[in-house]
């Protein structure tokens, strides 16, 4: 009877453990670090954190000054997402600082930041890095015309109308929302930063100032320039959201009734905070609005394979597959404004792609110009990741055997040449056969 070596017998349990561990790693969701002022925030904002856990996020809760904090180890990011619910932090613990968080964003990480009137310098510096400027500490957004009936008299418990939301369903959700309850610090966007998104703005009667002091100078933010929630999508598709209110994500604001303190104002049994918070988290953590390029093909019409080089004026067909991430699965993207450019230095052809089946395609005639060209799709729309595809091809001139023998526009020149030849022939015949008469004596 053949004996099995002891080493092989012992190796089987070890392999099983390794496979089990690998399965656990693969099954885990996006790794998310949550920084809190204190761990009590985990209980006061439990509904928001529960919505993340229900969607498969792996949350790690730590205080913002924990000395063991680290985002990067051996050049690798330890987390996919970062949530900062610690507005009053003065110094992050461990290896985390504003520069580290900026590097995390530059590496494609997603960050959700919630501030308050007790905002510390680190969040202010982080906002400046992203084109957002917070107002001073102890200031708040004030609106004497759009405050809640439960406000204590300072008019800082703001009722924000959904008309002030950014018109981008991918970011703020597609369903209609009840009014939003907000209490926190105001922000303004850097006008020189085109990447900043004004997700939720104050009304025309809002402003940001110290609620317990008389106004002696022009407020930091006034009217619709007052940002309550702002976003940013970097050129590397990293996403960041800044909320001026930590209470915006709290269970108390999620479950609170809302009614403006104005005669005849409608009362709502619940705010729209929860729905908006979930929609914002889905966008910032790249569950929504994520596009990718699938297979790309191009060939002459009537053929199936791309040639080594195209010829000027060829009729070609270009196809591209574009997919969108939806509920964790890649599905065909539905868009009617995707354009294709055929570019050498400048575009020679720009045309819309039409959806056909699960891909987008178009047929067009190549320009009568030879050189090195690119099929280019550059799709950049609000709320979606930047989609870019470029395929380089060569376009050569006609071979000498491919030119037309006779060009219609040259028929007059042909006629003049042949008529000249015929005239010369007739003249030659007449001249050669003409004989002078002999003179008589």
Curated annotation (Swiss-Prot):
The chain crosses the membrane at residues 413-432. Residues 1-28 form the signal peptide. Residues 29-412 are lumenal. Residues 433-441 are cytoplasmic. It is found in: Endoplasmic reticulum membrane. Its main location: endoplasmic reticulum. GO terms for biological process: protein glycosylation; protein N-linked glycosylation; protein N-linked glycosylation via asparagine; regulation of protein stability; response to cytokine; T cell activation. It holds the Pfam family OST48_MD. It is a single-pass type I membrane protein. Belongs to the DDOST 48 kDa subunit family. Component of the oligosaccharyltransferase (OST) complex. OST exists in two different complex forms which contain common core subunits RPN1, RPN2, OST48, OST4, DAD1 and TMEM258, either STT3A or STT3B as catalytic subunits, and form-specific accessory subunits. STT3A complex assembly occurs through the formation of 3 subcomplexes. Subcomplex 1 contains RPN1 and TMEM258, subcomplex 2 contains the STT3A-specific subunits STT3A, DC2/OSTC, and KCP2 as well as the core subunit OST4, and subcomplex 3 contains RPN2, DAD1, and OST48. This is Dolichyl-diphosphooligosaccharide--protein glycosyltransferase 48 kDa subunit. The lineage of its organism: Eukaryota, Metazoa, Chordata, Craniata, Vertebrata.
